[in-house]
A protein has these predicted regions:
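Glycine-rich phosphate/diphosphate-binding loop of Rossmann-like nucleotide-binding domains
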Residues: 6-7, 11-45, 150-189
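General beta-strand structural signal in soluble alpha/beta enzymes
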Residues: 5, 34-37, 58-59, 71, ...
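Glycine/serine-rich phosphate-binding loop and adjoining beta1-alpha1 elements at the start
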Residues: 2, 77-166
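Glycine-rich phosphate/dinucleotide-binding loop and adjoining beta-alpha-beta core of small-molecule
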Residues: 61, 68-71, 75-82
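An anion/phosphate-binding loop that grips the pyrophosphate of nucleotide cofactors and donors
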Residues: 66-67, 86
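Short acidic low-complexity segments
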Residues: 54-65
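Generic hydrophobic/aromatic pocket-lining and core-packing "Φ" positions
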Residues: 23, 47, 80, 101, ...
């Protein structure tokens, strides 16, 4: 099977659907992996790293000929127009977005939205929502620390003591728990 990895086109998107480690696993299983040129550049993954892992670097048009396409975000209208019948696409495809769902159904592709995976023990290794929420919780605290006008940890100096920041985190889901842990590690209370 030819598996294609497209460069993400959404503004501000730095993720890529496959890493060199993923490529190694897929090529070990005798799949051919086609990576769009510079697909991983925003994630600090070079084309050479993909080549070293066994992938072939292809143009956007060539990657769209793959049997299975991997994307992080849902394809836009231009990308959906390039899909061919009986092709597979896997990613965060926004299954409740009626416009995208309708466009994908007219192309007669098999679309598998990772958001729809059951969140249970058997599918835990494929649970992208939890892993992304974990990162979001961590990043939220890092950004909050940047905007906060004081310091997170308690500081004791010759000039006096600065009390630790008191942080309120709303929610105790995956993102909230990671935010709590990150803030605590940074010295906040």
């Amino acid at each position: 099977m030819i598996i294609g990895v497209l460069k993400e086109t959404a503004e501000g998107e730095f993720r890529v659907a496959a890493t060199p480690e993923t490529v190694k696993k897929l090529t070990t299983l005798k799949h051919s992996v086609h990576i769009e040129s510079n697909a991983g550049i925003n994630a600090s993954i070079t084309d050479q790293m993909y080549i070293d892992a066994g992938a072939l670097i292809k143009s956007n048009e060539e990657v769209f000929k793959s049997d299975l396409l991997l994307k992080v975000r849902a394809p836009n209208t231009k990308e959906i127009d390039k899909l061919k019948n009986k092709q597979y696409i896997v990613g965060l495809l926004e299954p409740f977005n009626k416009e995208i769902t309708a466009q994908l159904s007219t192309k007669k592709v098999t679309a598998f939205s990772l958001e729809s995976l059951p969140r249970n023990t058997r599918a835990q290794s494929m649970d992208v929502l939890s892993s992304q929420a974990n990162i979001a919780g961590y990043k939220a605290v890092i950004l909050a620390a940047d905007y906060y006008k004081k310091f997170f940890p308690m500081l004791m100096t010759a000039a006096g003591t600065v009390k630790a920041a008191r942080i309120l985190i709303l929610g105790a889901g995956v993102a909230g728990l990671q935010a709590i842990a990150t803030a605590k590690r940074m010295g906040a209370i």
